[in-house]
């Protein structure tokens, strides 16, 4: 599971209902319930809203670290900065677009669009990169500027 256990735990700690969170995200309650159980994957922009609401990092929500949040983390995701970070990270790890796209089981053109900042990387692709290579989601998304050690 990518985030479902942590998300439910955060929601229950704050005594917040699924309905309240669905209102914050401006989505139907039944859709949020499916998101929380990971029947549907939550888009990055909604995860960012939840991370900001609960004052936690993506890395914490993805269970990549026990550190709840990062000092001086930005609230918003800049798609251009995120794309540049992804491209630079890929090159530093000596991966071609073709190789990374193949590993993620996606089209190379979709990866190119992420790297150009046309789209924010999809949640499952981000999670796969972060878990396989132990790289911070918050760093790749441009929310923090320093690489952190992950478990």
Predicted feature residues:
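A short, Lys/Arg-rich alpha-helix, primarily the initiator
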Residues: 1-13, 69-92
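Short, structured motif recognition centered on aromatic/hydrophobic residues
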Residues: 7, 41-44, 86, 97, ...
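Alpha-helical residues within the helix-turn-helix
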Residues: 12, 23, 52, 91, ...
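Short alpha-helical DNA-recognition segment
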Residues: 15-34, 94-113
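Residues in the helix-turn-helix
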Residues: 20, 31, 41, 57-60, ...
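DNA major-groove recognition helix of helix-turn-helix/homeodomain DNA-binding modules
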Residues: 45-60, 124-139
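Short amphipathic recognition helices of helix-turn-helix/homeodomain-type DNA-binding modules
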Residues: 60-70, 139-150
């Amino acid at each position: 599971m990518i985030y479902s256990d942590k998300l439910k735990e955060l929601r229950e700690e704050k005594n917040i209902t699924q309905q309240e969170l669905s209102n914050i995200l401006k989505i139907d309650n039944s859709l949020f319930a499916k998101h929380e159980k990971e029947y549907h994957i939550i888009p990055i922009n909604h995860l960012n809203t939840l991370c900001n609401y609960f004052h936690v990092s993506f890395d914490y929500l993805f269970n990549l670290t026990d550190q709840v949040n990062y000092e001086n983390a930005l609230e918003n995701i800049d798609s251009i900065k995120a794309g540049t970070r992804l491209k630079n990270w890929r090159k530093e790890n000596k991966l071609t677009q073709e190789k990374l796209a193949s590993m993620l089981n996606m089209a190379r053109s979709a990866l190119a669009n992420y790297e150009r900042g046309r789209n924010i990387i999809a949640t499952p692709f981000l999670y796969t990169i972060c878990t396989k290579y132990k790289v911070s989601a918050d760093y790749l998304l441009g929310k923090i500027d320093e690489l952190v050690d992950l478990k």
